[in-house]
Amino acid sequence: MRTAKTVLTVIQERGKQKKPIERVYKLLFNRELYLNAYAKLYPNNGAMTKGVTNETVDGMSIQKIDRMIEILREEKYQWKPARREYIKKKNGKKRPLGIPVWGDKVLQEVMRQILEAYYEPQFSEHSHGFRPNRGCHTALQEIQVWKGTRWFIEGDISQYFDTIDHKILLEILARNIHDGRFIRLVSNMLEAGYLEEWKFKQTISGVPQGGVISPILANIYLNEFDNWIEEVLIPKYTKGKRQKSNPEYNKLTAEIQKLRKEGDAKTAHQLVVERRKIPSVNTQDENCLLYT
């Protein structure tokens, strides 16, 4: 049996080369991946949180893992509905949270590791959300090296996780994951529904917030938008090679140099501070890049 590291490394290499992967479902028969998933989930605070059953991390065993694998071999795995709770947001509103049972959570983590290994090398370098070793800090680091940027557009996709179209998501996955059994397993998971106040409700769209696999699925879905921006929109609207310099900035630079030659360091420093407040290039220039 191959180690989890070996399996994920092979998948990662396929992802780097943007080559399709096959027989993904068979990877779910590898016990090492479940032990890897268990080690990942066990330290989390939510490990003891119950779903719609009393099953928690303490009830996991090698025997249960083997039984889960056997059920998967028979293609009889049944996802259980998530238990829905609501948590308060900073703005006072409430956000729905879907809590899966422990067995489903472990299987989701195995699937997440496979998907992450394959898709992570293909994601945009300008994407920072829900990604390993990335976040607000890396986004800020990228912004710091931008030049001539005066405008930022802040946007929010309302209820993004809840509105992801299942059909489109599955079509995106099926492009490069040539394994009908694995795609069906994902589809069944998306349609497992949830219990709210012990009443079953169907899920016709979205991925559950609180699901281990949900962030990677959301990123795979939104990566289509990133690709469109970088491959279609940027080439279409990017003109010229560089922006024209800002006359006001150049004027201050010349004045600073003059003052330094005259020995007036104090006034020169004041102008340096003032110059920092304006861009060095003309942000209204037609050569201005739409996206950097």
What does each model-found stretch correspond to?
Residues 1-290:
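Non-catalytic terminal/accessory segments
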